[in-house]
Amino acid sequence: MSDSDSVRPGGAMNGTAERLDPTINAMTSAYDQATVVLHLERYRLAAEYVSGADVVDCACGTGYGSEILAQAGARSVQGVDLDRDALAFARLQHAHPAVTYYEADAIRYVPKPMPSVWVSLETLEHLPRPVEYVAHVASVLPPGGRFIVSVPVTVSTDGNRHHLTDFTRESLRGLLKRYGFAEERKLEQSHHFALSDVMGVSRGPRQRDRRRGLIRWYVRHPQVLWQRIKLTLTKGFVNEYLTVVAVKA
């Protein structure tokens, strides 16, 4: 067994797209391959803003994005996550002289050095207190600092048990504005899927993401069911995402 085998994604990282890594995940379906492309596009956008900067990559997961940011010329990258297994993998597979990985809570993490760029891709929807998190980021970044953030902007809490909050374009922008961020740039992404992708989730890397007992869950959350029906009738089977580069006033 090699060192990389000993920390190969297991536990929370095994059988979930929430801990994907383009270097190791067996993304065999077109849907899963598209998932990787979308994640990489977001990090490549963020990479355009990090040259010479001290950067936080919050919810860094397996660290592939932190490495991308370092390779783009960041002076330092603090990769932050709560998943100890993911961080162990990151330290081995995505080590870089400019990157340090920390096990920490996103809302309580106090970076050193203080960053001028805070990257937070597909994070807010997972947090029990996303408003508190944005307030924390705003308290850390200096005037002119950038908060690069992405969320799903179509309903996702029904299909993914790890998602706690559904955002819209308006709700994300309103939250950023509330804490003094002005939108500088955006990236809109669409991820179309077929019913067979949903039915085949048990065989793919998303098997641990799906919400079991969905009918009972819809009974408790009828507004989400209505949002899902409306989305499907108007746009078909699609997930949409918004990435915003926001500047602190």
Segments and roles (model prediction):
Residues E122-H126:
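A short His-aromatic
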Residues A182-R185:
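Short secondary-structure junctions
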Residues G159-L164:
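Short, solvent-exposed loop/turn segments at secondary-structure boundaries
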Residues M1-P113, V117, L121, V131-V134, ...:
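Conserved N-terminal segment of class I S-adenosyl-L-methionine
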Residues G145-V151:
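Conserved beta-strand signature within the Rossmann-like core of class I S-adenosyl-L-methionine
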Residues E132-P143:
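A short glycine-rich, Lys/Arg-flanked "PGG" loop and its adjoining helix->strand segment in the class I
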